[in-house]
């Protein structure tokens, strides 16, 4: 009788553990539908904003509403897809003076932890690998919305922003754009489709 009770207790604990794990939802970025964006802006000589985006990237995220500390994000970016709406400038930004996409074709971000700062928002801690350098960064995240889509799927959307320092990634030529070009504001908007 005691053995049966122990066995039943172990089964219940296992079931509870599995149900807790099942609460985490896995999402893929909606790249095909173009409902994901990575934009940036940087000051040009301190007189105006130079704006652009990375047009080719992919990513996934795991969302656990009950245990937000388990939330995870992974993103891979094609550095050569940088687009600032000016062909000659983009060629220069892709060159060895800046992103050097021939030697460093991919940038990536992988989260290490998440801290909730209120309902539907928090700080995503992780590592950004760019231009051959990996640095810890924090991204402020807010959930935009969630719910079913017209095609039988389920979606969840977030936006986030952070500030990068080009010298942290050995882009010393950033001084060519003026001292205020050291800081790059990065903004992302992501809609994920639940798997």
Question: Which ranges hold each PLM region?
Answer:
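Hydrophobic membrane-targeting alpha-helices
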Residues: 4, 17-22
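Bacterial N-terminal signal peptides
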Residues: 9-19
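Low-complexity, acidic/polar, glycine-enriched regions of mature
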Residues: 22-195
């Amino acid at each position: 009788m005691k053995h049966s009770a122990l066995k039943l207790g172990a089964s219940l604990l296992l079931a509870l553990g599995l149900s807790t794990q099942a609460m985490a939802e896995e999402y893929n970025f909606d790249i095909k539908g173009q409902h994901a964006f990575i934009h940036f802006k940087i000051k040009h000589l301190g007189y105006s904003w130079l704006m652009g985006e990375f047009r080719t990237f992919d990513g996934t995220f795991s969302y656990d509403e009950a245990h937000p500390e388990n939330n995870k994000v992974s993103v891979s970016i094609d550095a050569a897809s940088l687009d600032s709406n000016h062909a000659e400038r983009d060629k220069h930004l892709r060159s060895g003076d800046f992103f050097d996409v021939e030697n460093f074709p991919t940038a990536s971000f992988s989260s290490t932890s998440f801290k909730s700062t209120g309902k539907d928002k928090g700080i995503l801690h992780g590592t950004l690998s760019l231009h051959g350098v990996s640095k810890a960064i924090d991204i402020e995240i807010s959930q935009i919305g969630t719910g079913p889509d017209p095609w039988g799927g389920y979606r969840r959307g977030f936006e986030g922003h952070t500030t990068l320092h080009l010298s942290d990634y050995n882009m010393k030529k950033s001084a060519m754009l003026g001292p205020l070009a050291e800081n790059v504001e990065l903004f992302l908007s992501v809609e994920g489709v639940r798997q």
